[in-house]
Amino acid sequence: MPNKPRRNEILPHENLRIDIFFFRITKTDLIPYAQTMYDSFFRILTSSKSYENEYVMRAVMRLSSALYEGILPCLSQLMEKLVMILQRSSKNPNKPNFNHYLFESITVLIRTSVAQNPATLEQFEQVLFPIFTPIFTDDVAEFIPYVLQIIGFLLESHLTGSIPDAYRALFQSILTPSFWDRSGNIPALSRLLQAYIEKAGETIVKEKLVRIFDRN
């Protein structure tokens, strides 16, 4: 027995039902229009009236995810725009959904690019670490869990026993007791600490790890 329509529900005629798979949009469909779409998105996100529009930032994230390696031709432009937005938002991080999609967009770029070309790892570090450092020093609590996750992934992508000096300098910051007092930081901190132990345990971790646990 067919289901009874709910009030105000409009059901299509049987002859008008269309296979939804016919309309599935693929990466190939998106690539020719990607640049135009990004230009439109960032025109909104750089406008003084709508620069923290969470729906547009979500669209950036979803388009970037759908494009996968098709995103590479736009990589430099996207990182420049996203870093600019990150710098601006870090001064007043009062839009949690927007912030989430912003960091998700950055993460998609990193994961896709490093998977296709490991040499881009250093480029991301050069661009992002100068932004991440003041987030730590200014204790921007809303951003720290996201930053820790991204740094953890970047560090995990390095060969064991070989990490840049920037990570060594940062290690001192992640041992800050206040970071560990916030439950929201713990998962990302734990993963990042594990990455430090795996990649450079003998050189920078062993003698300093006791600081986390010896807090009398």
Q: What feature does the model see in each segment?
A:
Residues M1-N216:
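Karyopherin-beta/Importin-beta family HEAT-repeat alpha-solenoid scaffold
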